[in-house]
Amino acid sequence: LKADLPENIVEDIAMAVVLMGETPEVKNWTVYLVNLKNEPLTNVLISSKGYGEKDGKQVKTSVLRHFIGDMEANSFAGVEAIDPEVFGLTNEYWLSYYIGSTIYDKKFIFLPESIIDSNLIKIPLVNKPGVMIK
């Protein structure tokens, strides 16, 4: 049955963990969805969770669901603030959205320790430093 479904490829969509600001004591990070398409997205839904090993124990964060709604072409939307304490975990964002009547979905996975200064780039549209998966 699943073989009968078309493979809807997600392109020109990115998830980014963006450095919003910093003081000597703390860095503030926010996760953004970036729509690099020239068309709008509707019914955008993202579930997020973290999992992995911390201090020798398996840990999981709560699964959070974020309804973004509709996004204009070439736009971005904040998903959630993210605590640097979870950068040592695998952070997974499962995105689903519609273009017209066609549904698309994709998992974006930030591996442990991938959100580091040496991986920062300028995130398109947001125009701030961050780590992006496309």
Could you tell me what each predicted segment is?
Residues 17-24:
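Short, solvent-exposed beta-strand/turn "edge" segments of beta-rich domains on protein surfaces
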Residues 1-15:
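A general sequence property marking short-to-moderate contiguous segments
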Residues 54-90, 100-103:
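Intrinsically disordered, low-complexity Pro/Gly/Ser/Thr-rich segments with frequent PxxP/GP/PP motifs
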Residues 29-35:
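Short, well-ordered beta-strand segments enriched in hydrophobic/aromatic residues
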